């Protein structure tokens, strides 16, 4: 199944995954949840426990939610997931192209579009400091 995989801090990538529950769960790292934010025949498949598992913030979903962890976008039939069309692949790659950084400014959650390199630099754990020898 041709899908668009979107990982935190990375550019989206086109992938061909097996159309099985196990393969879909492997992509998102757990049990799946389908989200239907658009009127066309496409949906987001994400980890349904992303918040509880404290998965990293990934991309905003409109102006009302944030997807946690890796997700993929796939096409829809009347009762199943299917390949994205080339037009859908292009549309959703453009929509989710830029990784996003999330930070608090006071009590306001802010979102900044960034590059994978900048995301890695900002999100890297602080360097370990050399501990002073005990006396």
Show where each model-derived region lies.
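Short amphipathic beta-strand/extended segments with alternating polar/hydrophobic composition
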Residues: 14-19, 54-58, 84-86
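Non-Sec secretion/translocation targeting segments of pathogen effectors
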Residues: 123-135
